[in-house]
Regions:
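Hydrophobic beta-strand-centered segment that forms part of the acyl-chain substrate-binding groove
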Residues: 53-87
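Generic structural detector for well-ordered beta-strands
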Residues: 18-24, 75, 117-121
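Catalytic strand-loop segment that frames the active site of acyl-thioester-processing enzymes
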Residues: 8-42
């Protein structure tokens, strides 16, 4: 527990990172079902947002620690087509113990396509995996 508190103090508010993704067919709704249009699927956008959060925080994790998502509140407001580049950004807004709240956004070029918050928690990887396995 003490390492979590120490880490929480080490991560400065405003810490930010970006993840870039060129949209391919496999990232689209059409890859899930051909009835859908070939535009970026919301889960892929959210995945890039979570990736940006992870990239921002991982350098501050102690050995044996990582972060996992605990809540996502995101709006997906505009389509992105195959070949366009999506940039997802995360900025650390708040720390509450071992929980971290990131303001996230995504854009294609200069056009915003989504925004919201992603909450992440610090976990000890070994203990987390024990819990996952039910041991």
């Amino acid at each position: 527990r003490s390492s979590r508190r120490v880490m929480a103090r080490k991560v400065p508010l405003g810490t930010r990172a970006e993840v870039t993704q060129v949209v391919e067919h496999r990232h689209t709704l059409a890859a899930l079902d051909p009835k859908f249009p070939p535009v970026l699927a919301t889960p892929w956008m959210i995945g890039r947002m979570e990736g940006a959060c992870y990239r921002a925080q991982e350098p501050f994790c102690d050995v044996g620690e990582t972060t996992v998502g605990t809540a996502i509140h995101v709006d997906h407001r505009a389509p992105t087509t195959i070949g366009q580049t999506v940039v997802a950004e995360a900025v650390l807004e708040k720390i509450d113990g071992r929980f971290f709240i990131y303001r996230v956004s995504a854009r294609n070029g200069q056009h915003p396509i989504g925004s919201g918050t992603v909450h992440r928690a610090i976990v000890n990887v070994a203990k987390f995996m024990e819990k996952v396995r039910g041991t």
